[in-house]
UniProtKB/Swiss-Prot annotation:
InterPro entries: aa-tRNA-synt_IIb, aa-tRNA-synth_II, aa-tRNA-synth_II/BPL/LPL, Anticodon-bd, Anticodon-bd_dom_sf, Pro-tRNA-ligase_IIa, Pro-tRNA-ligase_IIa_arc-type, Pro-tRNA_ligase_II_C. It comes from the Bacteria. Consists of three domains: the N-terminal catalytic domain, the anticodon-binding domain and the C-terminal extension. It catalyses: tRNA(Pro) + L-proline + ATP = L-prolyl-tRNA(Pro) + AMP + diphosphate. It comes from Rubrobacter xylanophilus (strain DSM 9941 / JCM 11954 / NBRC 16129 / PRD-1). One of its GO terms (biological process) is prolyl-tRNA aminoacylation. Homodimer. PROSITE patterns: AA_TRNA_LIGASE_II. PANTHER family: BIFUNCTIONAL GLUTAMATE_PROLINE--TRNA LIGASE, PROLYL-TRNA SYNTHETASE. It is found in: Cytoplasm. This is Proline--tRNA ligase. It is an enzyme of class 6 (ligase).
């Protein structure tokens, strides 16, 4: 019997090492041969598929359709919007040779698709009757990152990017905010991550945007993570790419655009928000396996226990649960318990000879560690109920952590002390100047994560000038 167990570093002792070990040990991802590239393994990809399915349904419910656009973007396209190329050129990977021939123009491997999509929109949009255009694409992108971590910051990653076109500025802003709320709902309802939403400061806006709206999550180590963004692009790209349409007055005008994106970075957020010293803790709505039946057998009762475990597994599947039975004979029940805890399976179902004799099953929750004894015939029904209870409890736990680690600073010294010793979100007035923002970043390594939609007035802690509420944190 194989019993070798690799010990996971405790999150409470070294969260950075814990994270890297967990990604590997839970078989979520593996390193690629090119710096910053990773293979997303089947278990990690199954999580992404569930996120993708949920978001895709939300997009379609709000009138969006899917399409696909080219991976290779001519350099001349990127340079048409000045701020855009300035923001993305340093991160571009370039194709300069095709076969044996040097290309006349460099081709960027898609860092984001505004420029290439705008060229198509220029050809497709002619009249106000063509609007709005509500298109999303699921794809990979490549950004030449220098410092990488699996899921959190990688050179190549998977994402969706929505690109919409509207007749008026009001419609575009409404769309950008609507999609921000779609993201927020997905975080709360599916990932059980209580994100804050608001606006980015001008220096943190997407390159070429009029306004950037953001979902910011607080990770378990007290650092923030930009989890998803939605951009009001105004007419900047429409002007740069000469997208025009005839309005209802038969005047040729530029439309207004939005773009918004959500990536595999959220799997990193899922790990950091919910994971603990024993490994992953997955919300039931995302867990590839919601319940695992672990038979506990010894010698002569092995056949009976195995049959009962298989029967219970079938019942759980028929009840609509994503379930599996761990019938592996190479490892002990204790080893299996640790393995499924590491993988974050929401509920472990233990079934031994005594349980069969008593007509019961033992349910062990991953979120709390609590054990519950239920009648064998009621196990499937109770597990269905537990999925919702666990989902809600994990959100409550994450909300409690976020709230406990959100503090107001009354002086700059207090601000620096919180950032250095406690981390988390710090709420303080900001005078709106890039000078103050940059000084805070240099002295504390904290950045403005967002500007709340409802901002209170106060005195800037650094400059003493009048300011309005901003939320600061150190971030990934």
């Amino acid at each position: 019997m194989t019993e070798a167990v690799e010990r996971l570093t405790k999150k409470s002792e070294d969260s950075s090492r814990w994270y890297l070990e967990l990604v590997r040990m839970a078989k979520l991802a593996d390193y690629g041969p090119v710096r910053g590239t990773f293979a997303i393994r089947p278990y990690g990809f199954a999580i992404w598929e569930r996120i993708q399915a949920d978001l895709d349904a939300r997009f379609k419910a709000t009138g969006h359709v899917n399409a696909y656009f080219p991976l290779l973007i001519p350099e001349s396209y990127l340079t048409k919007e000045a701020e855009h190329v300035e923001g993305f050129a340093p991160e571009c990977a370039w194709v300069t040779v095709g076969g044996d021939d040097e290309l006349e123009e460099r081709l960027a491997i898609r860092p984001t698709s505004e420029s290439i999509i705008c060229d198509f929109y220029r050809k497709w949009i002619h009249s106000y009757r063509d609007l709005p255009v509500l298109i999303n694409q699921w794809c990979n992108v490549l950004r030449w990152e220098m410092v990488t971590r699996p899921f959190l910051r990688t050179a190549e990653f998977l994402w969706q990017e929505g690109h919409t076109v509207h007749a008026t500025a009001e419609e575009a802003r409404e769309e950008a905010l609507r999609m921000l709320n779609v993201y927020r709902d997905c975080f709360y309802e599916v990932l059980a991550i209580p994100v804050l939403t608001g606006m980015k400061s001008p220096s943190e806006r997407f390159a070429g945007a009029v306004e950037t709206f953001t979902c910011e999550g607080l990770m378990g180590d007290g650092r923030a993570l930009q989890a998803a963004t939605s951009h009001d692009l105004g007419q900047n790209f429409a002007r740069a790419f000469d997208i025009t349409f005839l309005d209802e007055n038969q005047e040729r005008v530029h439309p207004y655009q939005t773009s918004w994106g959500f990536s595999t970075r959220t799997i990193g957020a899922l790990i950091l928000v919910h994971g603990d010293d024993r490994g992953l803790r997955l919300p039931p709505k995302l867990a590839p396996t919601q319940a695992v039946v672990v038979p506990i057998w010894r010698g002569k009762n092995k056949g009976e226990v195995r049959r009962e475990a298989e029967a219970l597994h079938r019942e759980l599947a028929e009840a609509g649960l994503r379930a599996e039975a761990d019938l592996d004979e190479e490892h002990s029940p204790g080893w299996k318990f640790n393995e499924h805890e590491l993988r974050g399976v929401p509920v472990r179902v233990e079934l031994g000879p005594k349980d069969i004799e008593k007509g019961q099953a033992v349910l062990v929750r991953r979120d709390t560690g609590e054990k519950e004894f239920v009648g064998r015939g009621a196990a499937a029904r109770r597990l269905v109920e537990l999925m919702d209870e666990i989902q809600q409890n994990m959100l409550r736990q994450a909300e409690a952590f976020r709230d406990e680690n959100t503090r107001r600073a009354e002086t700059y010294e207090e601000f620096k002390e919180i950032i250095e010793e406690k981390r988390g979100f710090v709420v303080a007035p900001w005078d709106g100047t890039e000078e103050t923002e940059q000084r805070i970043k240099e002295e504390t390594k904290a950045t403005i994560r967002l500007l709340p939609f409802e901002r209170e007035e106060g005195k800037d802690l650094v400059s003493g000038r009048p300011g309005k509420t901003a939320v600061f944190a150190r971030a990934y």
